Amino acid sequence: MSNLMDKHTQKIDPQSLQHMLSVLRLEQLGDLKLTNVSLLDLINGEVIPGPILIDKGHIIAVGQEVDLLAAVRVVDCHGQIAVPGFIDAHMHVESSTMTPFEFERTTLPLGTTSIVCDPHELVNVMGRQGIDWFLRCSETMHQNMFVQISSCVPAVAGLDINGSDFSLDEMAAYREHKHVLGLAEVMDYPAVINGEQAMQDKLTTFNNLNLDGHSPLLSGLSLSAYVACGIQNCHETTNVEEGKEKLAKGMAVIMREGSVAKNLDALAPLITDFSSPYCLLCTDDRNPHEIANEGHINFMVKRLIQQHDIPAYLAYRVASWSAAKHFGLRRLGLIAPGYRADINLVSTLDAVDIQRVLIAGEFVDELTLESELEAKLEASSPPLHNTVKHRPITEAELTIPLKEGEYRVIGVVKDELLTNHLVCHFDGQHFAEPGVNKLAVIERYGHQLPPALSLVKGFDIEQGAIATSVGHDSHNIVVIGADEKSMAHAVNHLLEIGGGFCVVQQGEVTADLMLPLGGIMSLERSEKIAEQISDLKTAVKAIGVSLSEPFVQMSFLSLPVIPSLKMTVKGLFDVDQFKFVSLRVDS
């Protein structure tokens, strides 16, 4: 049975360790000495003077004792401060629309040296092929990519149609892999709480590894039952009261700042000296446009310090050591002997202005991330094949036969994945409340099912339509529009290009982004993706949409494990009651 001590970054090979010891005995030269540098001690909360000596990818000495030691290379850091490399404690690379190698090229220079990812987006599309590809990528990446094994594919059995199931036998086969830390977010919390045998078998199989959680708004006895089954963390916490209960019950709270779900400001007050070992940071779902304009984990650290007056040592602690400690990664998260030399150099702690980054003792700006990307991607054999399959859609299929009465409407909440369960009156011509648009979810795995139809409020589309093949977690096509003709045009365009995002206005596609890899990922550079996302944002504003991230927000309308009202290919789903409901209230 695998254990965490066998995982990536956990061990120093015997030959390297012997060399490190010989350097400390003054018998050989180390690889790199950082001089004119201080370092942040996250345990005592102090900045202490360097230098720092690195050998075989690891820190072997810090402080005045380093003056006794010599190295092959000496680098003057010009008074900068060394802090541990940042760890994104929960994320989906696919949600960035980038390949893992492009994600590495984009975020490693920003100081994110490790990521704990759940590839369940791609696994929902193509099963174990998706996990296999991520693990192949992890073997040749400089960034530490840990791959959690997707626990709920589909998110909840029977509620949606996806591209592939992922059985327990298939899941168990990955336990021994050195880049696998455990089970990814357990979204089917009713199955956990109700003690369903299939779920208990999954938890038991991975019991000696990490068990990641997903429990939005869960509290009281339900939360106690969830935690009692061994679930260790949650990234779906949205308010302080919820966070305090989870912390008190032994869960780590992973604070999220994604492209839509922005919970950092609400949860920042949770961070104290006492709680900080159990407070982690994550992006979950963050696209290249946000990364380019704001940053990644570095943005979160800066916000904690500058907007919330969190002491710098606590902000850096929750961005690194807390996550390393939580996941049992004993050689990550500190600037101390025996730890991997994953280091960010900043001019001041409060500015979080990263000057240089080291990964395993190598300066990132001296690596060949750009030139090696294409060869690495090709060698990884990405699973490129046609996954967006459906006959062309007609206007008639998207028409909802509305009659006077009360209708359930999905109420979108700005910058939240949670939705409201609205009831709106239709007088035979119009809805009493403005801004109600048509919504359709269309199965795209070749079953040729008719569209599932519903209503949504919050996008405020005045004309045209927007569509995406990124629809968590099953990734069927989601389309929202003011009229059926525009909606059909948008869907059919996605079918033609093999998946992606698009905007239709006055019968024309005004912006799009192709996602050929599983219908959810691009093969382009992050800069081009960010530019195309910017074009999409401009195009959606032109048809009346005011949401800051409409495509990300609409992609979660089909995820039936986040309250309150969602829409899958099987119909309208009330998450609070955990049952399908009719569109018309009196039906």
Swiss-Prot record:
Which reaction equation describes what this protein catalyses? adenine + H2O + H(+) = hypoxanthine + NH4(+)
Q: Which superkingdom does the taxonomy of this entry point to?
A: Bacteria
- Primary enzyme class: hydrolase
Q: Which cofactor does it need?
A: Mn(2+)
Q: What GO molecular functions are on record for this protein?
A: adenine deaminase activity
UniProt entry keywords in alphabetical sequence: Hydrolase, Manganese
**Stored InterPro entries:** Adenine_deam (IPR006679), Adenine_deam_C (IPR026912), Amidohydro-rel (IPR006680), Metal-dep_hydrolase_composite (IPR011059), Metal_Hydrolase (IPR032466)
Manganese as a keyword? yes
- The UniProt record lists the EC number as 3.5.4.2
Query: Which Pfam families does the record associate with it?
Result: Adenine_deam_C, Amidohydro_1
- Any one Gene Ontology biological process term? adenine catabolic process
**Which HAMAP family does UniProt cross-reference here?**
Adenine_deamin
Q: Which family does it belong to?
A: Belongs to the metallo-dependent hydrolases superfamily. Adenine deaminase family.
Instruction: Read off the PANTHER family from this record.
Output: ADENINE DEAMINASE, N-ACETYLGLUCOSAMINE-6-PHOSPHATE DEACETYLASE
Which protein are we looking at? Adenine deaminase
Source organism per UniProt = Shewanella halifaxensis (strain HAW-EB4)
| Gene for this chain | ade
